[in-house]
Structures are given as structure tokens and as C-alpha cells.
């Protein structure tokens, strides 16, 4: 895998070129630190290295396999809703956020995937077409 360093502007340009429905992965900073052992998370733990409950390492980043083209992440909780239509790269990037479909989530009913949003400033790396785009 080739590492390519890009700026925030380069990140925005890269995201706009990704076609709807195309699978890629990204690493970004979590809103709240999460314990990898007990699964608990809390924003007040962001400055800690270890979980105050069980003492294990806290995760500050999240890795997800994602797809773009999300229609409405707040109202769509089941895979298949929203499909990959109705939203261009520019629309997915509104208000400093990236809307995406997270393929790594397993729902209570056994189905996979969840519609989500993340702050663009928190994206640290994107894996696409055999390249790792590292945001500086």
C-alpha cells in the first residue's frame, strides 16, 4: 500500500471523486474515547490513557469500512434505506461533516450497517484504490 500525504483541501477533493456506493475505509478521531475491553465510552475520558472502570487501554480512533451516497443518516437505521442515490459528494460534505454508511456495525436484528456522520476535521486516513491517504 502506498502512503500519500494530503492536505485538508486535498481530502475534500478526494472525497468528491469517490463514486456513490464505492466501498473504502477511513480512520478518524472518536467523539468519545472508548474502552476496547469493556466497551464503555465517555467524552470526559478523552484525556485519559486507560479506562477508569477496568484499567484497559482507551481507543481514541475508529476504523470503519464505509460507503458514500447516504440519503438521510438520522432517519435511516436499516441497511438499504437511502441506497446510493440522491446525494452527491458535495451534499455528503455539507456543514463540515461527512455522511456515510458504516458497514462494520451489527444491529440488534442481525442486519449489518448504520448511517452515520463524522466531522471532516477528525478524519486522519482514507484507504482507497490500494493507497493510504494520510491527512496532514
Where do the language-model regions lie?
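Residues immediately within or flanking Cys/His clusters that coordinate Zn2+
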Residues: 32, 48
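Cys/His-rich microdomains that often coordinate metals
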Residues: 39-43, 58-60
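Short, conserved turn/kink motifs that form compact alpha/beta structural patches or helix kinks used as
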Residues: 51-52, 61-111
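Phosphate-interacting basic helix/loop segments used at nucleotide- and nucleic-acid interfaces
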Residues: 2-24
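A short, sequence-level motif marking secondary-structure junctions
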Residues: 45-46, 67-76, 119-125
